[in-house]
Amino acid sequence: MALISQSIKNLKGGISQQPDILRYPDQGSRQVNGWSSETEGLQKRPPLVFLNTLGDNGALGQAPYIHLINRDEHEQYYAVFTGSGIRVFDLSGNEKQVRYPNGSNYIKTANPRNDLRMVTVADYTFIVNRNVVAQKNTKSVNLPNYNPNQDGLINVRGGQYGRELIVHINGKDVAKYKIPDGSQPEHVNNTDAQWLAEELAKQMRTNLSDWTVNVGQGFIHVTAPSGQQIDSFTTKDGYADQLINPVTHYAQSFSKLPPNAPNGYMVKIVGDASKSADQYYVRYDAERKVWTETLGWNTEDQVLWETMPHALVRAADGNFDFKWLEWSPKSCGDVDTNPWPSFVGSSINDVFFFRNRLGFLSGENIILSRTAKYFNFYPASIANLSDDDPIDVAVSTNRIAILKYAVPFSEELLIWSDEAQFVLTASGTLTSKSVELNLTTQFDVQDRARPFGIGRNVYFASPRSSFTSIHRYYAVQDVSSVKNAEDITSHVPNYIPNGVFSICGSGTENFCSVLSHGDPSKIFMYKFLYLNEELRQQSWSHWDFGENVQVLACQSISSDMYVILRNEFNTFLARISFTKNAIDLQGEPYRAFMDMKIRYTIPSGTYNDDTFTTSIHIPTIYGANFGRGKITVLEPDGKITVFEQPTAGWNSDPWLRLSGNLEGRMVYIGFNINFVYEFSKFLIKQTADDGSTSTEDIGRLQLRRAWVNYENSGTFDIYVENQSSNWKYTMAGARLGSNTLRAGRLNLGTGQYRFPVVGNAKFNTVYILSDETTPLNIIGCGWEGNYLRRSSGI
């Protein structure tokens, strides 16, 4: 029997649900309210700092959709969509007024988490209700001065000697003029275009007594009286219409139009059948003396704004307006040449912003607005394509692929359906000609939680029978066009229950957070670290805020996480700061690890001279009620007083009674955090040069003792369980006799704590527990025992 030992360098690997013989040495069985720091080791998670009470338990609805608005460092808000309305809070918990100039029907829903999607661009938060069908306005419009079959033009270009000009309207000649043969010098005047126009108009006025005939620069405008119309309109000039030609509201080509025309006169350019150009409409602008492309006649040109995505807009007064958006109408073409975007007549599933275009997902289509014109989904011209025209493309796959989410990713747009992923990209400028949409991968995706991008990775949820897997989507190194995904929960397959509704995280602190209504009191944390494109750390654990608590949101800005949570009485906003060695509150003697931590000045009138106690009323401190948890009061000199939860809960006896007269004193109050870390079984493990781990599974390991290495740590307890026997060992922080030990101050210890562990290693359970307010940093651990093996391996 040989006495052996093994050291484990760190405990940064989180937990694993694999059998103990398959785990890495740095992985444990359970980690609650811990933080796996790649530099400081295993720590207590940062504390919740109380910011404000947002209302009672139901103030934000049953299952609200909560969106973080991060405009800049001074304008940061939580927008809460309750299902019946919107509430906006800044990140100090102060509520902003939300006005509804067009009502709030668009965001009314029984399930806002499932039905609402949104994206923020500057002061605008664009909001989509996936249950609302975008509809067109069925009212047809006509621009002013359009008189179908009532008027027409004669384009007069000039004359040619000896030619006869004839104007024929409704079956009769209304003007006829023979140009002289040019034998006399004065005949040149008879070939002048304007002279010919006046001559023909004079005859037309005589032959069409009730009609209006006007002459312009190079044209004649004839208008039928009320009750009559132009049924036929032709001209003859003996020169193939090169001298004069009729211009009704239809023309074969743009070259047939006169240089000038009455203001607002409209013509449809039918086009040459031998050319691929679409038909289009032009209208004369007399002020600018040009023909401009315009909207056709009897055309539906507008969507119903009330059925389109709305916006929550930050106003100049600091409050918010929820309102319709003024979506641009069509400016050219008709229903055939300028069709409706594919989202009209369908519901919109997501809204996004990509390459300076606002985009929608609807059915199997991706629709992008014109460049920098976010409310315009129609081309500026039918006759000429432009690089800034809108884009409307559909995915191509043999399966039905209803698109659910779009996430900008590595200069591309990653698009998700329930079972497949697509990438929209373009070489160079993104235009309707250069756009490419390709199927890249096929992974199942959970619809309720939006995929979230952190760095060069996108994290998404894949549901299984009872639990959810989280995948990391990435571009393969050196081959950016090749995409893949890996299951980062493969070693904890039964950890996150189904019902995931939020995936967030921070690229600053390298973590991803997951919320699930299957276990609403927890934040599931994935801590990772990549160095030179290699994964150096992946750690799963969870933060537990108590079974009576629901976490509604936990989104991050830089190194701060802002958490909205509620207990059975009230709803709160709190902050978690990941900054190392941070002092959360001014005057705090040290960073106290307490949840809902608050600085409080004890008011006068709270001291009772008879009992020599100062009584603090918990609802007065927070403006809210609490039911469960151990409370600690920390004084500026480091003295702490711990209050156990009353049997019936704090709501039955909401008073903290402190010894002595503390009126006017500043104290720090909060709920203790229960940190738990359970080690994997202490087994003999070998790590190869390639990083793989093998476990000695032959023989018997009889443990004798174990140790943990700690740094700048307060007190913690170690529990050892060996079947029916249980032991508890306490590390009290700084040791007696230490030069750094001072009365009335924070005393932290650094060193190694050794404790007995006896029995077969396969049956020992060892875990650390700490609910004190002091820090905890476990760097590594190790064990010592007798190893007996009957045979030698080969």
From Swiss-Prot:
Keyword Transmembrane assigned: no
Protein localization: Virion
Recorded GO CC terms: virus tail, tube
Cell cycle is among the record's keywords: no
Gene Ontology biological process terms, A to Z: symbiont genome ejection through host cell envelope, short tail mechanism
Highest taxon in the source lineage: Viruses
Protein keywords: Viral genome ejection through host cell envelope, Viral penetration into host cytoplasm, Viral short tail ejection system, Viral tail protein, Viral tail tube protein, Virion, Virus entry into host cell
Main function: Structural component of the short non-contractile tail. The tail complex is involved in viral genome delivery. Forms the end of the tail, including the canonical tube, the nozzle, and the small extensions below the fibers. Once the tail tubular structure is formed, the interface between gp11 and gp12 generates the proper environment to interact with the six gp17 trimers.
Oligomeric form and interacting partners: Interacts with head-to-tail connector protein gp8, the tail component gp11, and the fiber protein gp17.
Protein name: Tail tubular protein gp12
Organism: Escherichia phage T7 (Bacteriophage T7)
Organism lineage: Viruses, Duplodnaviria, Heunggongvirae, Uroviricota, Caudoviricetes
